[in-house]
Amino acid sequence: MSRMKVLIADSINEKGISELEEVAEVVVNTTITPEELLDAIKDFDAIVVRSRTKVTREVIEAAPRLKIIARAGVGVDNVDVKAATDRGIMVINAPESTSITVAEHSIGLMLALARKIAIADRSVKEGKWEKNRFMGIELNGKTLGIIGMGRIGSQVVVRTKAFGMDIMVYDPYISKEAAEEMGVTVTDLETLLRESDIVTIHVPLTPETRHLISEDEFKLMKDTAFIVNCARGGIIDEDALYRALKDGEIAGAALDVFEEEPPEGSPLLELENVVLTPHIGASTSEAQRDAAIIVANEIKTVFQGGAPRNVLNMPVMDSETYKSLKPYIELAEKMGAIIAQALPGNIEKLDVTYCGELAEMQFDILTRTMLQAILNPILTEPVNLINAPSIAKKRGIMVTEARRSESDGYRSIIIATAESDRGGFSVEATHIKEPTIIGINGYRVDVKPEGTMIIARYRDLPGTIGAIGTKLGQHGINIATMQVGRKEIGGEAVMVLKVDQSVPAEVIEEVKKLDNVDDAVAIEI
């Protein structure tokens, strides 16, 4: 088997390259042009980039072997994540690599504003000695407003508490318990802006956060307040910021990121009460080393068949959660395989209900696994855990998930109901030491889903079971086990047969023609 190939398209730390060379053939081309990349990418299984190289939809569609796009850093603005997801390509990054580095840079910019370090430095270099001009303020006793309490925001809290700052936080996702543990006050955005002496931003750029801080927000702030942005350009409306600084609505700003980079022609360049750095928040040797090692290890993990931790376009879980879910991942795959073969027509809807302990767990990966098993047999394009939901959506398949605390005496149950243009099919299953089907179309059974099975709907009348057995015997097909589920004598029933041989389609057709048999299907697991 040939080795995997990895393209390093931007400069990364040598330690990351060394890690990759243990499991793959590594090609380093840190000056590759977009045109060259478009031609070369077809030969690679993974690509590592920083911020220079753009991995566009065009590049992704020219990469039949590509399995992983790795960003040696945090932001993936230069990667078309949707296109990667559609193709089933993992997008991974190294979010923890820059947390401390960016937090320290943010605090450095706060100090630069508070003590007017940048303009004081410039003044001395111009031969001046203007001590009275550069009267600053202490951070001690001031109120810091942090917008976003993720990895970086949390690191800012730890460090600014040492300065003696009072800390307010705006983050809709932080729990009261977590806030109390960190010793911060959670509040709404308006209150934070009104009461903070310094505001620092640590949220991603999304449609919701674009121009989160604009004209109205600056009017809420103290005229002595500073604002710092080391997150993403575009979160602050730079035109509104310029007006707020010119009109004295706030005292100063420090930016490491911009709406356009570099910010050529920006009026902010003219202002003395602005500190600007060229997007270097993550630029320390330690952060670059850590980012390279983290993504290299993630790629190694994938190549060796393991589960990576930092995938942006599929569920990520810790090892304990994965261990708890692993039996149900196998179960969901088998359920999907049964649905794919038993459901007549083209699937239009899939409803999955998680009962018992599973209802409290991270079950998205189970739905993805089931979708993958349903879609793979009917599509020519590859389906995996990453692209299964997007492929289902593209094909107009409605997928819903629900949770239920009751589980009929079992620890956990998965109930999957599929509908198509020609009917429906449902399967209910649990894990009792091994995967077990406990219901078919609402009828109780007890079957281990493995090998070749025949599922038949029939009317529970004398001689019907015998006729099915005889018909199979005529074709040399031996029945290993049989399960029957019924609700009343003489009514509709479901039979699940496990047989020792594959069942030809023509034999199934003969079974379906037997008296009192409504339908039958052969299932291969």
Swiss-Prot record:
Task: Please tell me whether the keyword Glycoprotein is annotated for this protein.
Answer: no
Reactions that this protein is recorded to catalyse: (2R)-3-phosphoglycerate + NAD(+) = 3-phosphooxypyruvate + NADH + H(+)
| EC primary class | oxidoreductase
Q: Which InterPro entries match?
A: ACT-like_dom_sf, ACT_dom, ASB_dom_sf, D-2-hydroxyacid_DH, D-isomer_2_OHA_DH_cat_dom, D-isomer_DH_CS, D-isomer_DH_CS1, D-isomer_DH_NAD-bd
Q: What positions constitute the catalytic site? A: R232, E261, H279 (proton donor)
> What are the UniProt keywords, alphabetically?
Amino-acid biosynthesis, NAD, Oxidoreductase, Serine biosynthesis
Known EC number(s)? 1.1.1.95
What are the BP-aspect GO terms? L-serine biosynthetic process
GO molecular function: any one? Answer: NAD binding
PROSITE patterns for the chain: ACT, D_2_HYDROXYACID_DH_1, D_2_HYDROXYACID_DH_2, D_2_HYDROXYACID_DH_3
Asked if 4Fe-4S is a keyword of the record, the answer is: no
The positions annotated for binding NAD(+) are: R151, I152, D171, C230, A231, R232, D256, H279, I280, G281, A282
Which ranges carry the ACT domain? 453-525
Instruction: Describe the family membership recorded for this protein in Swiss-Prot or TrEMBL.
Output: Belongs to the D-isomer specific 2-hydroxyacid dehydrogenase family.
Q: Which PANTHER family match?
A: D-ISOMER SPECIFIC 2-HYDROXYACID DEHYDROGENASE FAMILY PROTEIN (AFU_ORTHOLOGUE AFUA_6G10090)
Name the UniProt record assigns to this protein: D-3-phosphoglycerate dehydrogenase
